[in-house]
């Protein structure tokens, strides 16, 4: 069961909206008390599957330089004062689970006033070597975090379709995103979900919107939701641009954001399940989209 951790007076959706991937940090060290709180929080966090997962926090002065060229997009680690390494047993869907747990942790960082940025981590053994990690578990992901510098206001682009792009202003670093309206379908891929319909569920609309704000490699957002009453079906696309590992981590992050909104509004909802062998519906999905998980509200 997913345990909500935020005070009821604080809104999960606002927290998700406020989270940005920060790439510039102050040199101020993160207090040990906050690091201890993060580790404790992660160790009690829910999982999507039964898997051994561990967290290590590196806050030494030379951590950024040791990781440079080994982790991060094109080897850039953004000189953060601290780094989280999530280690996982390798089994089916372990990267999706790692993304799910990591996004939950990133939202906790945001609540604590700490900024963060996911780093690509393609070479598990090399990362473990430079960080002196002695473990048989694989590096699932690395997160840079600390006290972020305020970034200038910028233009936010929401891509509804190639010919329909909306523009708005928002503080901080914002990369173009696929709009929520382009991520959800009603019963099958031939019918876009009508968020404006008087009978549509506003909580589901918020959940899709929250998922659309989750971190995604190069903001490709390869996931799609098919909504059929109280049943949610999650599809994923593998492409030639986004590495498979980063794709699956991003999928897990989207699943967390979607689920946490539902769990904050509804009681007794089910959990994401990966066994979809009993689902026989024709979703008319493109051949490059695969049904990955289902959720019953």
Annotate each language-model stretch with its function:
Residues 4-297:
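Acidic, surface-exposed loops and disordered segments
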